């Protein structure tokens, strides 16, 4: 479960051009729940998503993933949380054109498996299932270009 309680984020804090991007944001996202963040340009959507993805910090409030309070843990533990619990697709993403669809999907799986005993065969099966979920199984072995 993901919980935000009264999150505040200010850019250029303490300066004359300070801007409060988020003020008092609270939300709960249950395991398995899908949520869409919508709003006008400049509404704070990207700021909120960067905080949720543990890419950026916040000024006050509390952010919890399961039982862990984010912001009160080490950078090493934060990296582990990003690796195990958080996924984010950027608005402007790029595929490696010379790679197949399967190879592109394998990149984050291979990265996450570094230092762990996860077999490549198992990761490939996960990647294949992911491609099936989005009805791209026919493109598994084709370059994405």
Residue ranges of each PLM-predicted region?
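Conserved ABC ATPase "signature" region
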Residues: 68-69, 110, 118-139
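A short, flexible loop at the N-terminus of ABC-type nucleotide-binding domains that lies
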Residues: 1-4, 10-24
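Short coil-to-helix segment of the ABC ATPase nucleotide-binding domain corresponding to the Q-loop/switch region
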Residues: 99-108
């Amino acid at each position: 479960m993901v919980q935000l309680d009264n999150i505040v984020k200010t850019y250029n804090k303490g300066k004359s051009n300070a801007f409060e991007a988020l003020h008092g944001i609270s939300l709960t996202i249950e395991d398995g729940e899908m949520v869409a963040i919508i709003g006008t340009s400049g509404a704070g959507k990207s700021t909120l998503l960067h905080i949720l993805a543990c890419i950026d910090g916040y000024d006050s409030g509390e952010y919890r993933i399961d039982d862990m309070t984010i912001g009160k843990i080490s950078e090493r533990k934060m990296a582990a949380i990003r690796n195990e619990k958080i996924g984010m697709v950027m608005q402007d993403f790029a595929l490696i054109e010379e790679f197949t669809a399967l190879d592109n999907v394998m990149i984050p799986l291979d990265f996450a498996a570094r230092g762990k005993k996860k077999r490549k065969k198992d990761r490939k099966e996960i990647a294949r299932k992911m491609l099936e979920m989005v009805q791209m199984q026919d493109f598994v072995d084709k370059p994405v270009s």
